Amino acid sequence: MMWYNLTIKQLKNVRNFMIQKPKGTSDFFLEKADLFQYILDTFRKEAELFNYSYIQTPILEFYDLFYRSVGETTDVVSKEMFIFNDRSERKMALRPEKTAGVIRSLVENKLIFNAENKFYYYGSMFRYERPQKGRYREFTQIGCEWIEDNSDFSDFEILLFASKFLGNFNFNKVILKINNLGNKVERENYLIELKKYFYKFKDKFDEISLKRLEKNPLRILDDKEINHQDFIKNAPKLFDFLNSETVQKFNNLQNYLRKSNISFEIDYSLVRGFDYYNNLVFEFVYYDEESRSELTILGGGRYSNLIEELGGPKKDAIGFAAGVERLMILLKEKEWEKPIKTSIFVFNKDHEDLYKNFDFVYKLRKRDLVVKQNVSNFKLQKIYSKIVNEGIKFLIFFDEKLNQIIIKNLINKNFLDLTNKSQEEKINLVKKFIESENKNENNSK
């Protein structure tokens, strides 16, 4: 019997009882936490290079936000959301995605017309899915939203941003897939024909697909349970219903991508999982040669009606999101190694030394140096092997033979005298010595 099936009385009688994390959630620590933070830091730096500002919104939102934006017939709203009533009987939801929350925040705080109209985010999302590789009930997304007029250049820039971000990880088999869902009028004309076509195959649909057939047949194309069947593959293509202006913009985008050496393929079946998308949609897909399967690692698109739908003005926007855990899986398979930072150990010979050096150590850390120190065990010979085994390259200590305070390179044994120097002089000398030693080491390779 699992612990969550036990009564309170039974739990009280279980000695050494251990509560486990819920199914589909993760703990990150040590190497996993380093990898997690590395991905967030990489995204943050890339987002700021493209002039995005950070935005944070609540994990908890009103259910209606996602019902109105993501779409009633989507898998996320119809099957996967964590929904509950609060004590005031208001229907709440844990956010399954971030775009709706970001737009709600921008509308509510009157930021839609703000000059700073690019925002990036990261945080936990929640979907009640069957946990498997790359799919979790709590997962972390990084993403961005750009409130910008519909143009082929803004479409291109968002793809360039996504491509540059993923380029930091040197994945071998990542394919950019793009499609155009058209504007509202084009899509409505298409849906009329799509509905007529699907009515011929009503007997092949389950209850959920029949509901989608009436409310939004486009969602049937996104259903992974049936979209491999021939009658789905042979359905009318939305691209055939686009007007010349929409097609021209899409062609311009393709030319920009070619000129920038960003390889891509057009996937006319690509619709994405949310109802708010129109015009450009895209996914960066990783192809696993061993399992011959595809894993979407980043996806997004343009949305022209969501801002107005959530009470704002008629305004265009575009954005994307990526799953951090999926990126972690791929980087771990690539045998990712934590970027090495030069580390220093400051040895304190006694408690007096320890208190005297606290400010010195803090100021070294402020100079972007990784510094460790001993707070007990004041015998250097007892901890020297541990310092070396941790990969620490530089040691600052009082050398009794030389009667000097020195910084020593533990690899080549070079050292520099720091005796009788002011704290600021010591810090500058340490920084210069480390830079010089690292430069000489790199030149000798």
UniProtKB/Swiss-Prot annotation:
<dbReference type="GO" id="GO:0005737">
    <property type="term" value="C:cytoplasm"/>
</dbReference>
<keyword id="KW-0648">Protein biosynthesis</keyword>
<dbReference type="InterPro" id="IPR015807">
    <property type="entry name" value="His-tRNA-ligase"/>
</dbReference>
<dbReference type="Pfam" id="PF13393">
    <property type="entry name" value="tRNA-synt_His"/>
</dbReference>
<dbReference type="GO" id="GO:0005524">
    <property type="term" value="F:ATP binding"/>
</dbReference>
<keyword id="KW-0436">Ligase</keyword>
<keyword id="KW-0547">Nucleotide-binding</keyword>
<dbReference type="InterPro" id="IPR006195">
    <property type="entry name" value="aa-tRNA-synth_II"/>
</dbReference>
<keyword id="KW-0067">ATP-binding</keyword>
<dbReference type="InterPro" id="IPR041715">
    <property type="entry name" value="HisRS-like_core"/>
</dbReference>
<comment type="similarity">
    <text>Belongs to the class-II aminoacyl-tRNA synthetase family.</text>
</comment>
<dbReference type="InterPro" id="IPR045864">
    <property type="entry name" value="aa-tRNA-synth_II/BPL/LPL"/>
</dbReference>
<dbReference type="GO" id="GO:0006427">
    <property type="term" value="P:histidyl-tRNA aminoacylation"/>
</dbReference>
<keyword id="KW-0963">Cytoplasm</keyword>
<dbReference type="InterPro" id="IPR004516">
    <property type="entry name" value="HisRS/HisZ"/>
</dbReference>
<keyword id="KW-0030">Aminoacyl-tRNA synthetase</keyword>
<comment type="subunit">
    <text>Homodimer.</text>
</comment>
<protein>
    <recommendedName>
        <fullName>Histidine--tRNA ligase</fullName>
        <ecNumber>6.1.1.21</ecNumber>
    </recommendedName>
</protein>
<dbReference type="GO" id="GO:0004821">
    <property type="term" value="F:histidine-tRNA ligase activity"/>
</dbReference>
